[in-house]
């Protein structure tokens, strides 16, 4: 896998209808939450950002099953409201339907800080990692990750 690789592939149900998130350089971007079931039966609620042009081509409504291919993105929220580091999936491709549930991400980048190994209250070995994944135009996504089990040591 090459350095600075960032690919997300998800399939789940839209938990809500897309709403306007922001406008950048005259392009509107919409946000919705994708609910993807884990093997345990718990659902991951993942924020997805979609350009209006893509949403016009593939409309999404609450309850729809949709496949999303894109990248994991981050930015620092300096407004003082909500989380400081905002992480979301930026959709490059939307497809109606799909083999739900599916949740896969592939990342390759540079470690920003020394990894921090620790044990959970249940005694599992994990390791906290901050990964920097560069993208075009001098930007980078800083992504907190957790390694589990043998990979964590």
Where are these regions (language model features)?
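Single-stranded nucleic acid-binding surfaces, predominantly the OB-fold ssDNA-binding core
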Residues: 1-153
């Amino acid at each position: 896998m090459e350095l600075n690789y960032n690919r997300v592939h998800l399939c789940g149900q839209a938990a809500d209808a897309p709403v306007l998130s922001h406008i950048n350089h005259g392009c509107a971007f919409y946000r919705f939450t994708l609910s993807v079931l884990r093997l345990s039966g718990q659902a991951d609620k993942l924020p997805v950002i979609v350009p209006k042009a893509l949403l016009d081509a593939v409309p999404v409504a609450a309850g729809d099953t949709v496949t999303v291919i894109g990248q994991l993105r981050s930015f620092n929220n300096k407004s003082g409201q909500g989380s400081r580091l905002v992480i979301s999936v930026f959709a490059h491709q939307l497809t109606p339907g799909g083999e739900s549930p599916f949740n896969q991400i592939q990342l390759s980048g540079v470690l920003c800080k020394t990894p921090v190994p620790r044990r959970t209250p249940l005694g599992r070995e994990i390791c906290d990692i901050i990964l920097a994944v560069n993208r075009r135009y001098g930007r980078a996504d800083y992504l907190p990750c957790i390694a589990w089990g043998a990979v964590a040591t």
